[in-house]
Design a protein with these regions (language model features):
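Feature captures the catalytic ectodomains and active-site-proximal regions of enzymes
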Residues: 1-218
Length: 218
């Protein structure tokens, strides 16, 4: 008799799989939940490749909104291509335009937006395509920044890991330079755009050797 078990239970909503080796870490107070408790209406926006990142992962392991009345999830279907090096712009433009609409609408107090380009195209190892991918995100961010300014808001730009920032690596065996298709271990940017900053808050100081991660953003 054979018993099949996964490394962990990856579908908490449906309790699947039934047999697993390690329990899933629980996140009892994800940031989205805090927003719901404050009654802040929010939108999540990305394309297919990163939809779980703005829903399942961001919610601490649950796919569905905690309160559908004030949480809107928006998905733009990704291009169906053999490799994203063939379409490095992906859906950055569409995501940017949709985000502008949501920001200008005045209906939301918070928005979570994920651009997939730098990661998905970075995985292809195609340097030229990666440059186009990053440029596409830059072009989408520009109008979003103006929209945020128009509604007296502020924006935080960051990432959970690098990829397109390091497209070449040295082969440990041959010593030759070759394409890198893996995540990098470099520190990621953390940018705050607040055109009306009045000194009412400041960024927390962390020790230089502290292991920082996304949980420190909020």
């Amino acid at each position: 008799r054979v018993c099949f078990a996964s490394m962990m239970q990856y579908d908490l909503d449906n309790g699947f799989p039934e047999h697993f080796l390690a329990g899933t870490p629980r996140v009892d107070n994800p940031f989205g939940k805090r927003l719901v408790e404050q009654g802040i209406k929010q939108f999540r926006l990305t394309e297919t490749q990163k939809f779980p990142h703005v829903t399942f992962f961001y919610n601490g392991g649950y796919r569905e909104p905690l309160d559908p009345k004030i949480e809107d999830y928006h998905l733009i279907p990704s291009d169906k291509v053999p490799t994203f090096a063939d379409a490095p712009m992906m859906k950055a433009s569409e995501i940017g335009k949709r985000a502008e609409e949501f920001i200008h609408s005045g209906a939301y107090g918070y928005g979570l937006i994920n651009f997939a380009n730098a990661d998905m195209v970075g995985h292809t190892g195609n340097l030229e395509a990666a440059v186009q991918a990053v440029e596409s995100v830059d072009q989408a961010l520009g109008p979003m920044v103006e929209a945020v300014k128009a509604v007296n808001g502020f924006m935080v730009i960051t990432a959970d890991h690098g990829n397109a920032d390091e497209m070449l690596t040295k082969n440990r065996v041959s010593g030759e330079t070759e394409a890198s298709t893996k995540h990098s271990l470099n520190p990621v940017p953390f940018l705050v755009y607040d055109p009306f900053y009045d000194g009412s808050y400041r960024l927390r100081d962390f020790a230089a050797n502290q292991d920082l991660n996304l949980s420190h953003v909020a």
